[in-house]
Amino acid sequence: MDFKLTSKYKPTGDQPEAIKELTEGLKRGDKSQVLLGVTGSGKTFTMANVIANVNKPTLILSHNKTLAAQLFEEMKDFFPQNAVEYYVSYYDYYQPEAYMPSTDTYIEKDLAINDEINKLRLSAVSALLSGRKDVIVVSSVSCIYGMGGPVAMRNNVIKIKKGEILDRNIFLRRLVDALYVRNDIDLQRGNFRVKGDTVDIAMAYSDNILRVTWWDDEIDAIEEVDSISYHRLGTFDEYEIYPANLFVTSKEQTEIAIRQIQDDLVKQIDFFNESGDSIKAQRIKERVEYDIEMMKELGHCSGIENYSRYFDGREAGQRPYCLLDFFPKDNLIIIDESHVSVPQISAMYGGDRARKRNLVEFGFRLPAAFDNRPLKFEEFHNLIHQVIYVSATPANFELKESEGVIVEQVIRPTGLLDPEIEVRPSTNQIDDLMEEILKRAEKHERILVTTLTKRMAEELTEYLLNHDIKAAYIHSNVVNLDRIKIINDLRSGVYDVLVGVNLLREGLDLPEVSLVAILDADKEGFLRSHRSLTQTAGRAARNVNGKVIMYADSITESMQKTIDETLRRREKQLEYNAQHHITPTQIKRSIKEILPTKNISMGTNIANEKMKLQKYDIPSEELPMVADPIIMKMTKVQLEKSIQNTTALMKEAAKNLDFLQAAQYRDEILRLQAELEQK
């Protein structure tokens, strides 16, 4: 089936030319292209048109789950007759296994899986396994993490036909091989039950139940029924049942894997003994032998993913299978907000390996644990057939990949201008901000506020709540489904103000937002770079009254570049509006539930009562030293002292396995050293 785009709109402004150029590039065989599209110019609509034109299975990669959910919703609206799927991490909570030698502390893996997202992941893989070409998968960086191989998955697909002669017990064994669990009492997703000649299967990737009925050894009927009412939804002459888990294997491969694990265990014990580390040798012996016994008895063990190389039949160092392996070779990858997504992909491997190094070196895991990992960037890049990098601020990598040729989309079909930017002094910035909030709340408009740290976001939210302002916050400690719900609540008026740190920048489609307030805009650094400021300001570009207020005591180079670029785009849009007699019109977008969520709150709890702030356990955060413009006036001695202090902080963070913080300290050191060299 081909892609069929459904929309009441036609491409306008820069969109027709952008769609034409990107489509021609793909049909010409260009590997890499860049779509430079400003906020509100309809990049998603352009992407949908290109997908429909080239008719290829497509992976859309987003750098966070919230934006992935938003893209998923929009693509489902554009392609209601095609398979639009969602593939992100299914953890509501995840504490990875770790060991800190400085305190001799071992941290057991702890997690909570979201069953709804797990269903969507399995649905995405099932759609690709089905062989249909009209598949769009919207994914986070989870698409580069290891999973079972496509061959093993296909071998465990169960194909049945009405009228087929098939012994029921053989069918039940095949269900078990596909990791379905028999439960005749409570039929949950991924279970099956047997009642006489009828087998009900609660498919892991669907909300419905497949009912297969036998007459002797012949399949008499195949029906899909509602999981609650058991009303028949449809009948089938043939059906494919896909595995209930993304990691499946055969009994034969399990036996081979166990033998290989035993061989590698002997080698690792010998290695530790030869090094004089008898404690490590004993530790690895006890842990792995226990895991092997569990595999023999139950077919699995805790942390079985660390043995995935053996079950996949991979060599040491060979990359794991990932979602991309399930796509046909002639596919299309669209990397949204590429200036953030590409560096994120690059960083995944290093962080994973650093954590596992201690586990392997101290005898908690075999070296094979290193091979349960995300792809290296080079491996991901080698899997790309054709790619479109999408960003309002593409980075040097994307420009180099496309050989400097970019498709520009800066005209908004709605006629909306880039928001005006006003710089105000930081003195009394909170009082000034509250005045602006109250003005817009009276007009039923929404406000975004960005701070520099998570703690500042929480404290500002609490302050606003204490002054009877409907406010909430989102940051990285807030789980995915909570973030999605709070954004919908902001749009629907449950909240007037949303406070955040780094999650309010790229891609959020919030036409109700008329004001973006950037606190401490002059604190030069990652969160206040030219790209970050441009992206943050863009959140107000979907509202006819859009405005940005930067609170700062000086205008940094990044601020000036953002202001200048905004003025250039405003002039271009004004010229277009005048030529086509367009009056800027407010974007109206329906508010709908992106993913099924429970009645949960994100930061605040509103139920006809006073809102209460939900606190997260956030460690003390420091602003980057180099964010302070005073470093330009520091003496040579002061710079050397700062480098020394920051190096100590970096080592301490690395020792505590806080690699993100350590990387930030490393970047500070490099900038301090660069400043020192100029003295």
Regions found by a protein language model. Give the residues of each.
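Conserved pre-motif I regulatory segment
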Residues: 1-36
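N-terminal cationic and glycine-rich segments that engage phosphates or anionic surfaces
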Residues: 34, 87-432, 436-442, 461, ...
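Conserved strand-helix element at the start of the C-terminal RecA-like helicase core
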Residues: 57-69, 86, 280, 440-462
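Conserved helicase motor "Helicase C" RecA-like lobe of SF1/SF2 P-loop NTPases
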Residues: 151, 453-475, 671, 675
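Walker A/P-loop
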Residues: 28-50
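Conserved RecA-like helicase motor-core motifs
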Residues: 80-89, 303, 446-448, 460-482
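Conserved helicase ATPase core of P-loop NTP-dependent helicases/translocases
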Residues: 478-500
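Pre-Walker A (Motif I) flank of P-loop NTPase domains
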Residues: 28-34, 56-57, 133-135, 445-446
